[in-house]
């Protein structure tokens, strides 16, 4: 009863409104400061951010046991290592590299890829994208990428990471919601998306 009477008084409502307004304004200004700081960090990183195009790797006596390799990890049966070798999961060495002596291992495989750079198998897309002659294509893509897309690729450090990111299914591969433009070629590293198929 007393609380109801107190809340009906104009000065109490004014104080509650004033405190709410102060809280709202301070929260908004803090959020704006964070946004400005984040933009500044991205711009600073963009200006000096360069992709490392050649993977530094010492083959030594070709046993390849000395160094570690990163690989595409996610494949159920196939994997691609950072040197562009595609191999079956069973032919992966402990250091993460494909065993180049295994019959299933091949470098720079474009088996399931079309001329527009779209492939039906993710690992072949990454391997094909890692070919040294694909560097100009990827540089053109990075230079023409929309601002929001460039922010996504600022975390990419080298050619391998760029190919991993580029070959993942993107919105360019999708025709409508969960329908692919071309279900047989949904992993793309190229500039042009797959052709639209009739629904």
Swiss-Prot record:
It is a single-pass membrane protein. Glycans are attached at residue 61. InterPro entries: SPRING1. GO terms for cellular component: Golgi membrane. One of its GO terms (biological process) is positive regulation of SREBP signaling pathway. The chain crosses the membrane at residues 12-29. It comes from the Eukaryota. Residues 30-199 are lumenal. Residues 1-11 are cytoplasmic. Keywords: Glycoprotein, Golgi apparatus, Membrane, Transmembrane, Transmembrane helix. Positively regulates hepatic SREBP signaling pathway by modulating the proper localization of SCAP (SREBP cleavage-activating protein) to the endoplasmic reticulum, thereby controlling the level of functional SCAP. This is SREBP regulating gene protein. It comes from Danio rerio.
């Amino acid at each position: 009863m007393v609380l109801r009477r107190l809340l009906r008084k104009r000065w109490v409502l004014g104080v509650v409104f004033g405190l709410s307004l102060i809280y709202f304004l301070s929260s908004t200004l803090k959020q704006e400061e964070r946004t400005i700081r984040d933009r500044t960090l991205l711009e600073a990183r963009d200006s000096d951010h360069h992709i490392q195009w050649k993977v530094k790797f010492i083959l030594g006596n070709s046993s390849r046991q000395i160094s570690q390799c990163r690989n595409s990890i996610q494949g159920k049966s196939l994997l691609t290592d950072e040197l562009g070798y595609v191999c079956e999961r069973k032919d992966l060495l402990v250091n993460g590299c494909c065993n180049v002596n295994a019959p299933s291992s091949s470098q720079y495989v474009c088996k399931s890829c079309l001329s527009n750079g779209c492939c039906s198998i993710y690992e072949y897309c990454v391997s094909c994208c890692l070919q040294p002659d694909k560097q100009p294509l990827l540089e053109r893509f990075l230079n023409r990428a929309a601002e929001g897309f460039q922010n996504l690729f600022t975390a990419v450090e080298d050619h391998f990471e760029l190919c991993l990111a580029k070959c993942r299914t993107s919105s360019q591969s999708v025709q409508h919601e969960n329908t692919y433009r071309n279900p047989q070629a949904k992993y793309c590293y190229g500039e042009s998306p797959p052709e639209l198929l009739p629904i």
